[in-house]
Amino acid sequence: MAKKKKYGVVVSRYGVNTGLQVGSYVPVADNSGAKEVMIISVPQVKTRLRRLPSAGVGDLVVVSVKKGTPQMRRQVVYAVVVRQRRPFRRPDGTWVSFEDNAVVIVNPDGTPRGSEVRGPIAREAAERWPRVAKIATMIV
């Protein structure tokens, strides 16, 4: 079920509902300098013709920084979705949803650009991205 992929992490979808599609504006939950980003691509997601690719908790996305420090603005970077408003079901039967959507800016190898993550992150994202989980304050 889980396979080693190009980005150096084990990919396993857990059946997470995808709550963020291409074009969504999402706040950034770390201190990398970016405040708000727009999702421009979801790597390795194949979908039907003319359907927008979407991402869920734990997915890697390509984003464009829209608001933030002058050094970060207008850059195209990778990010990991750590929170989403749309409810998703865990294997034990519980449903989880957060108050907001949020991403964490990462390098292509999965190391976070910031040194701390504000707010909780989902357990699915923490298991899939251990380096992001290391700087998180709370895992739900």
Curated annotation (Swiss-Prot):
Q: Which GO terms describe its cellular component?
A: cytosolic large ribosomal subunit
State the UniProt keywords alphabetically: Ribonucleoprotein, Ribosomal protein, RNA-binding, rRNA-binding
Gene Ontology molecular functions: large ribosomal subunit rRNA binding; structural constituent of ribosome
Q: Which GO terms describe its biological process?
A: translation
Report whether rRNA-binding shows up as a keyword of the record.
yes
Task: Report the InterPro entries cross-referenced here.
Answer: Ribosomal_uL14, Ribosomal_uL14_arc, Ribosomal_uL14_CS, Ribosomal_uL14_sf
NCBIfam families registered for this protein in UniProt: PRK08571.1, uL14_arch
Q: Which PANTHER family does the record cross-reference, listed alphabetically? A: 50S/60S RIBOSOMAL PROTEIN L14/L23 (PTHR11761), LARGE RIBOSOMAL SUBUNIT PROTEIN UL14 (PTHR11761:SF8)
What is its quaternary makeup?
A: Part of the 50S ribosomal subunit. Forms a cluster with proteins L3 and L24e, part of which may contact the 16S rRNA in 2 intersubunit bridges.
* The family this protein is said to belong to: Belongs to the universal ribosomal protein uL14 family.
Q: State what this protein does.
A: Binds to 23S rRNA. Forms part of two intersubunit bridges in the 70S ribosome.
Q: What is this protein called?
A: Large ribosomal subunit protein uL14
**To which species is this protein native?**
Aeropyrum pernix (strain ATCC 700893 / DSM 11879 / JCM 9820 / NBRC 100138 / K1)
- Name the gene for this chain: rpl14
